[in-house]
């Protein structure tokens, strides 16, 4: 921004944190100094941790997710394929601990931050799917046990 005294710079930092065992978070922050922006983003990313929690080497099913103009497709892959994705999406999936997955950006945006948020939404959708599937499986097991009695 330009003021009477001259240009006033602001820096925006996007930080991804993860333990490679199913927890990942994203933080975005602005500041007048790069180091301060990174520190703020790191704290925000720690607050926004999401438990992905997949026990297998890949994701359970194909998922499409959208955030603003960014749209992403995540597909499960066979063991040994590794992560087929580019840029920040690859970093996010690595830090989440997903070993074999294919990702394709379908949206028309080149904005890395919106692409990362679209990927986070996709991982949240998968977590909801997993929870729903486990709930249905538990109901079926309960019904089978009741039939045997």
Each predicted region: which residue ranges?
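Ribosome-associated RNA-binding proteins
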Residues: 1-149
């Amino acid at each position: 921004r330009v003021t009477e005294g001259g240009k006033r710079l602001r820096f925006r930092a996007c930080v991804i944190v993860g333990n490679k065992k199913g927890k990942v978070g994203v933080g975005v922050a602005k500041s007048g100094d790069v180091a301060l922006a990174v520190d703020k983003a790191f704290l925000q990313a720690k607050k926004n941790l999401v438990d992905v929690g997949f026990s297998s080497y890949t994701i359970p099913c194909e998922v499409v997710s959208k955030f603003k103009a960014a749209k992403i497709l995540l597909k499960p892959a066979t063991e040994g394929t590794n992560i087929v994705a580019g840029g920040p999406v690859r970093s996010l999936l690595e830090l989440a601990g997903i070993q074999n997955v294919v990702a394709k950006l379908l949206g028309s945006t080149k904005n890395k931050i919106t692409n990362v948020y679209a990927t986070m939404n996709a991982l949240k959708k998968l977590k909801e799917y997993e929870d729903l599937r486990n709930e249905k499986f538990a109901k079926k097991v309960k019904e089978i046990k009741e039939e045997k009695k």
